[in-house]
Amino acid sequence: MSDQDKFIQMVLSSGPQFQKLLQVIGRESGLSEDLRIVFQKLESSTLPVSDLVVKNIFESERANYDWVSYELKPLGVGTMAQVHRAKVRMNGKIKSVVVRFLKPGIEKRVYEDKRILSEIAPILDSNHVYLASGLPKLTPLVEDLSKTIIAELDLKATVDRQNMGYRVYRGSKTVDLGGYKNILKIQVPQVYWPTTPTKLMVQDMVFGKKLEKVSQQYESVLPKMKKAVAELVAEVWIEEVLFKSGFFHSDLHQGNFMVEFREDETKVNLIDFGMGGQISSTTQGAALALGVAVELLKPETITESLWDLSEQAHNLLLKTQFRALVDAKVLNIKHGLESGVKVEDWVAWAIQKGIKFPFIFISLNRGFGIINNMLKEAGSSHTLATISKKVGLKYALNIAKDLVDNESVTAKELVKLGLGIKKVPARCENIFMK
């Protein structure tokens, strides 16, 4: 057995939180090709539960669902859940559906994993060798990861998020796929939730393949398909979270949307709403102010925005102390001692310094990175910066009013950034500038 295979077996024998952590790392940019291949193998090597367990799960739900048939072989297997094809009778009609359930016993493993990692993290954080390595503190990372994993245990919350996605993630656009025009249509499968308690999530069967496979299949005749799909998904996502309801899917990597190509219309089905949420208009405004402040390297507004976004009562330092740290960091950037950083980097840095952000904002921050990485993997020349600028053209007046009225920046500073009324949406570019 090769060292690579040994590593994979070791990870598969570990707890769900550690596996999830490695999956997140595997989706980050900057990994070597060897590591990328290892993480891809890990994601495709997750073991399913036995056929007998699957059968018992389906049969125990007959009071909720009138099964016509179901497949014991899983359609897909994840760290915590798996999905199966089935047919169910509803209102006298037979529907093809996909059934998702959490693996039996996974909740116990999640909390056991949390206990172990929570004990190990502070020990490593205080180890002089680890401290000298310059690596980030593990304790806040473990806390955030635990919240993410535990949130996925709430099946009803996942259903609620998918129902929200079903309502708001709608968009279609005629695009050039490379010498061929086609309509791209974004949609989310409908969920069927019974009135009595259930452990299953039953949703419409959607067809299609992962974007990578579809784009490879049609690469010779539709060379721009991969980029076009990724860019439309990013447009719909960023418009909803920044300019509309504030709702977001925080894990929209390429594995979480299925593409069904047809000559007249290509359907892009967004799936797996285990992670996500909805931010308030106040959070939207604070995030926008932070983005502009980061671009201006304006320490007072960076401090105010990060502090406003945080759980202030739980921060481990005073606001004056945090302001001093921000001042020093800005000075280092201006003197070339540190490279310029994005909003996501400022948030990660603040966490390491003891700022406590609500889980919803951390989840959103992760979503920013996932979308940016998705665009990069698709070979798009766009980033969230340029996508946001394009989408923001519809909201120019509101953007200008919010930023100036909240005294986050002055009108003169907006002009300095090229953010006159006609150009205000460019502020989105400043938020996600790389």
Name every feature range the model reports, one short phrase each:
Residues 1-249, 254, 258-285, 290-434:
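Broad phosphate/nucleotide-binding scaffolds in NTP-utilizing and phosphate-metabolizing enzymes
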